[in-house]
């Protein structure tokens, strides 16, 4: 008797805090979408975070979506209440 069909593959759930920690460990450049501000994004390297998703970003920049204009901010602390999405923008895949 042969098995036809796909074997059942169990997927492992990735916790959000683990993904943020991986970005921190790999020093990945991330882009943060802001809550209720769709015209502005923040990019930088995560150097710290806490259980409230407050982030400390190094080499942070404001990126204006429409004009692609950038403004250097340096090291900042971004409150978790303002975060809608965090995505990797580093050239290498994590």
Swiss-Prot record:
Which CDD domains has this protein been placed in?
Sm_E
Q: Which Pfam families match?
A: LSM
Domain Sm stretches: 17-92
SUPFAM superfamilies recorded for this chain?
Answer: Sm-like ribonucleoproteins (SSF50182)
**Looking at the keywords, is RNA-binding present?**
yes
Where does the source fall among the domains of life?
Answer: Eukaryota
Annotated GO MF terms: RNA binding
Subcellular location, record wording: Nucleus; Cytoplasm, Cytosol
The entry's cellular-component GO terms read: catalytic step 2 spliceosome; cytosol; nucleus; pICln-Sm protein complex; precatalytic spliceosome; small nuclear ribonucleoprotein complex; spliceosomal complex; U1 snRNP
Task: Spell out the PROSITE patterns in the cross-references.
Answer: SM (PS52002)
GO terms for biological process, alphabetical:
mRNA splicing, via spliceosome; spliceosomal snRNP assembly
Q: Which UniProt keywords apply?
A: Cytoplasm, mRNA processing, mRNA splicing, Nucleus, Ribonucleoprotein, RNA-binding, Spliceosome
Quaternary assembly: Core component of the spliceosomal U1, U2, U4 and U5 small nuclear ribonucleoproteins (snRNPs), the building blocks of the spliceosome. Interacts with the SMN complex.
- Role noted for this protein: Plays a role in pre-mRNA splicing as a core component of the spliceosomal U1, U2, U4 and U5 small nuclear ribonucleoproteins (snRNPs), the building blocks of the spliceosome.
Indicate the family of this protein: Belongs to the snRNP Sm proteins family.
Quote the protein name from its UniProt record. Probable small nuclear ribonucleoprotein E
């Amino acid at each position: 008797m042969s098995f036809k069909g796909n074997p059942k593959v169990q997927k492992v759930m990735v916790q959000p805090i683990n993904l943020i920690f991986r970005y921190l460990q790999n020093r990945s450049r991330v882009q943060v979408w802001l809550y209720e501000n769709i015209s502005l994004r923040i990019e930088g390297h995560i150097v710290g975070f806490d259980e409230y998703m407050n982030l400390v970003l190094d080499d942070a920049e404001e990126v204006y979506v429409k004009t692609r204009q950038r403004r250097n901010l340096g090291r900042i602390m971004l409150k978790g209440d303002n975060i809608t999405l965090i995505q990797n923008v580093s050239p290498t895949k994590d």
